[in-house]
Each structure stands twice: as C-alpha cells, then as structure tokens.
Amino acid sequence: MERPQSSIWVFMLLLFMVLLQSPAWHVAAQRCPQTCVCDNSRRHVTCRHQNLTEVPNTIPELTQRLDLQGNILKVLPAAAFQDLPHLTHLDLRNCQVEMVAEGAFRGLGRLLLLNLASNRLSTLPQEALDGLGSLRRLELEGNMLEELRPGTFGALGSLTTLNLAHNALVYLPAMAFQGLLRTRWLQLSHNALSVLAPEALAGLPALRRLSLHHNELQALPGAALSQARSLARLELGHNPLTYTGEEDGLALPGLRELALDHGSLQALGPRAFAHCPRLHTLDLRGNQLTTLPPLQVPGQLRRLRLQGNPLWCACHARPLLEWLVRARVRSDGACRGPRRLRGEALDTLRPSDLRCPGDAAAGDGDGDEDEDRPAGPRAPPLRSPHGEAAWATPCPPACACVAETRHSTCDGRGLQAVPRGFPNDTQLLDLRRNHFPSVPRAAFPGLRHLVSLHLQHCGVAELEPGALAGLDRLLYLYLSHNQLSGLSAAALEGAPNLGYLYLEHNRFLRIPGTALRALPTLVSLHLQDNAVDRLAPGDLAGARALRCLYLSGNHITQVSPGALGPARELEKLHLDRNRLREVPTGALEGLPALKELQLSGNPLRALPDGAFQPVGRSLQQLFLNSSDLEQISPRAFSGLGKGLRSLYLHKNQLQSLPAPLGLSGLELVDLSGNPFHCDCQLLPLHRWLTGLNLRVGATCATPPSVRGQKVKVAAPVFEACPGWTARKAKRTPTSRGSARRTPSLSRH
C-alpha cells in the first residue's frame, strides 16, 4: 500500500525539478527585482514609487509592459532598456527625469507607448528618440520643454499621438515635426506659444486634430495652420486673440470643427473662414463679441456657439439673425441687452424684435434700446469696418473698447489720425494697419495705465517730441513695419519704464542711441531688417539694462570695439544676415552675461584663434551656419568651455575642421551640409566624433570612395593614417599611460 504513494512523491519531485529548469520559471523566480512585482502570465512588471535611481537590470527579458512611475531616475543613459526588446508599453511618469541621452531607447523596436509625462525635461537632444520606429503614442505632457529642435521626432514614423501640453514652449520653428507622417493628434495646449513659423506644421500630412488652446497667440497664425491640410478639428480657445479676418490666411479644406472660445475676440471679419469649405461647428463662447456679421462660409456650417458673449440684440444684429435663419445655422447665444430682451435666446427671436431708437417698429415706446451697456453709460452703437457693432463707453467712433479686458482696438479702420477718447483704464491699445505719418505730441492723453501700444503697419515716419507723454506704465511699444529713420529722446521721454521696443522693418541707418538714453529700463530692442551699416561707440550708451539686441538682416559691416560695452547685461546678440567679414571679437569685450551669439549668414570665410575668447565663460549657444566658412583655426574656440551647449556650423564650405576639444557640455552640434574631405587631416575630428554621443550630420564629400559616409563611422579611411595605431594601442592597459587620451564629450 505504500509503494504507489512513494511513486507519486517521486513523480512530483521530478516534475518540480523539470519546471525549475524551464526558462519561464527561471525568469519568474530568479529575474524579478526585489523592489518590483512581476506578473509573468501577462508579462507585466511594476516598480512604482521605489526610489529607484536607475532602471533595474534583472527585469525579465520577455516583459512587455514596464511601469516605473514615481522613481528618481533623473537621467536615462544610452541603451537603458536594451535588454528588454519585447517592451510594448513603458511608463516613466513622475520620475524626475532631467535628461534623456541619445540612444536611450535603442533596441525598443516594438514599443507602442512611451509615457514621459510630469518630469523635468527642458530639452530633447537629437537622436534621443531613436530606435522607436513602431511607437504609436508619446506623452511628454507636464515637462519644462522650452524649444523643439527640427529632427527631434524624425525617427517616429509610426507615431499617431504626440502630447506636448503643459510645457514652456514659446515658439515653434519651421519643420518642428518633420517625420511624423502618421500623426493624427498633436497636443500643444497650456504652453506659452506666441509665434509659429510659417512652416512649423509642414510635414504632418495625416494630422486631423490640433490642440493649441491655453497659449499666448495674439493673432491667428493662418499661414502656419494652413500647412496642416488634413486638419478636421482645430482648438484655439483661451488665447488672447482680439480679431480674426480673411487677411489672417486660414485655409483648411477639411476643417470641420473650430474652437475659438474664451479668448478676447471683439470682432470677426465676415470672410474669416471663407476658405474652410467644410466647416460645420464654430465655437465662439466666452469672448467679447457684441454682434457678428453674416459669415461668408460655404453652406456646411450648422452650429455657431455664442454663449458667454455680451450680445446686443438691437437693430444692428438683424443681419446676423437673418443669416442664421437663412443658412439654417443653430446658435445658442443669449442677449445681454437691451433690457427688454436680456436673457432671451438669440435663436428664439425674429428680426422684427431687434430694433433701435427711432425705428418705426418701436411702437411700444419702451425706449430701452439705448440703455446701459456693460461698459457704462449710454452710447450709440460703434461700427467696425466690416459692419459689426461694438459696444463700449467711452470709445472713439470706429473703435471697440472692452471694459472686461481693458483692451481697445481700431485695427485696420482706415484712420488718418490717432483717435482720442479711449477709456482711462485701457491697458492694451491696438492701432495697427491705419495711416499715421506722424504721431503728434500728447497723442494718448489720459492713458496712464497703458501697458501695450501697437502701431505696426501705420506708415509712421515721425514721432514728435512728447508723443508718448503720460505713458508712465508703458512696457511694450510696437512700431515695426513703418517708415521711421530716426527717433529722438524727446519723443520717448513720456515712457520711462518701456521694456520692449520693436522697430524692425523700418529705415534706420544707425541705432537710435540718443533716444535710448530716455529708456533706462529697456531690456529688448528689435531692429531687424533695417539698413544699419555699423555699430559705433556710444550707440548703446543709454541701454545699460539691455538684455536682448536683435540686428538681423541689416547691412552691418563693422562692429567697433566698445560699441556694445555699455550693455553689460546683454544675454542675446543677433547679428545674423549682415555683411560682417570677421567675428567682431574686440566688440565682445565687456559682455560677461552673453549667452547667445547669432552670426549665421555673414560672409565670414575664416575663424581665427580666440575668436570668442571674450565671452568664453558665459556663451551657451553659437550660430555660425551659412557663413561661407572655409577655414577654422585650431584654437578658434579656445576659451569656450563646458558652458557651451549648442554649436551650429552647418551649410558652410568646410573641407576640414580641427577637433574642438574641451567643449564637454555640448548638447547639440550641427556639421551637416559641409563638403568634408576625409583624409588623414580629418583624423582628429573623426576621433572627437567617436567620443561624442551626439548626432552631428558630418559626412564625407571626398574622396569618391567614401562620399556620403558619416565622418564618425568612416574608420577605413583613417586606418592608414599616422597615429591610428597609437589610438588603438591606447585601449590596452600597457599603453594607457603613453598614449594621449582624447577627451570624451559623452553626456553621461
């Protein structure tokens, strides 16, 4: 009776030993990190909130889903997940990640979802996302990204959703999303975007939904948006837009839904959406619209959302109501006034219900059509050039003044003189696209609260002395695209707290140095695309607080030593697209805070030794692209150390380049578009590149046998060079001390 029972125990023991040797059991029992939970049946591993500082190296190889939320990884090194080739989902939320090294995700060719939300990323280096050819969804929400470099997403050809919401983006460069051929939804909400380059959205042929709500767009970027030809849904709510019209150039043939809700819209051009033939739903809730013109859109518009606007249901709204009925468009707005119609739904009214004082239809004598408006006492309706009514008191004729936002606008009204009579508490005054050849003395009386003044495209040729009198709080002055050739200190005396002065696209031949003496707090001066030919001592004598100086696109041939000296706080200097034949090294003396130097597009041809020595300790970004560079001295970058983050040398004529040793902090180097001659003279550069964990784009143009090969990997060309064997020997312990060690610029 005992033998069968003994046989059973022997069988179970043998079975246990077999299972113990199986790969699955071995993985489950031996490879699960102690701080993690491994579910081998579903191939899930969870290591949440374990204070991990690096990715555990004993995670089962067959894992498909890895959850590392809430750890302290900070840096993701190259090949951090190379032992997990089967991963499809990777969650790295709230891991305090500050840097992703290039190649961090290489080997994850099956990954579908990468979640990097709620970390501390301020930049993404090129090649950081290499190896993710199957990725469908990338979450970068809630980081600290300030810029996007073209090419960052170039390896993500399968991506369908990209989430960049809740970052710190202020600008989208051209081709920012190049390579995203299948992306259908791009989320950019809750940033600080104010400018989109015209080609920013080029290269997104499949994009169907774009979220740009909660940004700082003051004008509709129609040219940029129209690049996304397949867009069906566009979300632009919660931006400080005050007006949009056909001139903004929005042309989206497939657009079905457009959200412009909760902005500052005061007027809308009748043909603003004339080039969106399939538009079905237009959301204008929560703006400052008192009425709308009949919109000239093709017949597919079916819903117009107007809730939360101060609609004034008087005779001026009849064309709108008649159009809504005729076009069979449903609307949900309600009347703010007059009193007898307050709270009435717009779509329940008849045209005869909308009347003004003196109308024959006003037979009941109630006399309330001209009663109190939201902005104050009674005033007649104000008309914009497109026929919209705009109610505010006081306010000059043909302008619109909104009490809630303290904004007043006369944009594009055809005015020949600066109007008067704006509300005394106005903070933003928009007078763009009128015709004021001269701005007279005391042109803005009573506007002591004014913060931002827009005078672009007004044909201004002169600001008379005292023109800005009384504008003690003015911070932003926009005078771009005018006819100015000079400015006097007397003209600016009334705005002593001005911080930002925009003078681009005028006729200046010199920096208006005398005028700057009246602006002791000026921090940013824009003089792009003028005709300035030189910078001389004294030009910036009054600009001691200046931090940003933009002189791109002028005719500058000389920057004299001492010309920039008074601006010791200067952080950004843009001298690109000028006629400089040499780096103005002497002029860089005395700029201890300079971080960004833009010299691209000048005919420099050569860089001598110590060209940037004066700003070596502070400089972080150096732009030398498209500068006809043919020769760079071996010590051209001497003085520049680990503080330099970006070096742009692309699109030059360099056949050779000395290795810029000592630049250990580089995060971006661009050497593309140079005709490098790959011979022994280039060996130092080859060595430097092999120790540099960055994508630089340097390729061989000659000899023909290696044309098109990357300098970094073209080792066969250099194997016969003197010194090549010494490099190989350097790797062995016996020769380590005798061979000179090449510094590595790897970021990890």
Curated annotation (Swiss-Prot):
Main location: secreted
Record has NAD as a keyword: no
Residue windows of the LRR repeats: 85-107, 108-131, 132-155, 156-179, 181-203, 204-227, 229-252, 253-275, 276-299, 423-446, 448-470, 471-494, 496-518, 519-542, 544-566, 567-590, 591-614, 616-639, 641-665
Record-level GO cellular component terms: collagen-containing extracellular matrix; extracellular region
Tissues where this protein is expressed: Expressed in cartilage, including articular knee cartilage, where it localizes to the extracellular space in the area immediately surrounding the chondrocytes, not detected in any other tissues (at protein level).
Signal peptide from the UniProt entry: 1-29
Domain LRRCT: 309-357, 674-722
Cysteine pairings via disulfide bonds: C395-C410, C678-C721, C680-C700
Region (Disordered): 352-389, 728-748
LRRNT domain residues: 30-61, 394-428
Protein localization: Secreted, Extracellular space, Extracellular matrix
GO biological process, any: negative regulation of collagen fibril organization
Keywords of the record: Disulfide bond, Extracellular matrix, Glycoprotein, Leucine-rich repeat, Repeat, Secreted, Signal
Residues carrying sugar: N51, N625
Protein's UniProt keywords contain Nucleotide-binding: no
One function term, GO molecular function aspect: collagen binding
Compositional bias ranges of the Polar residues kind: 734-748
Superkingdom as given in the UniProt entry: Eukaryota
Pfam family, one: LRR_1
Family of the protein in this entry: Belongs to the small leucine-rich proteoglycan (SLRP) family. SLRP class IV subfamily.
Self-association and partners: Associates with collagen and binds to collagen fibrils.
Function as written in the Swiss-Prot or TrEMBL entry: Potential negative modulator of chondrocyte differentiation. Inhibits collagen fibrillogenesis in vitro. May influence chondrocyte's differentiation by acting on its cellular collagenous microenvironment.
Name of the featured protein: Chondroadherin-like protein
Organism: Mus musculus (Mouse)
Gene name linked to the record: Chadl
